């Protein structure tokens, strides 16, 4: 399995699974999250409003990517309270991404540097 860590415009990356970090209580109205939500046809805010995802450690949302996106799936992982991310919580989030990719039989993962 190919795993890449990227900085910059993560939404333009190509892979089977795109991993995005989210923080507890995060405002989904930031420019980045609005863009992601637009690309994913409103699914991010819909799930957040339903309280299915709050950005807590261990929480995740797996969203099939729409046509035209260079990935098959987007995985949004919770990292907890912003500023409290530790090496261990980042490792757990990365592990969750790899486990998800294995379950889906995916060959490549790209994640933002968190």
Predicted regions and their residues:
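Glycine-/small-residue-enriched capping loops at alpha/beta junctions
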Residues: 1-114
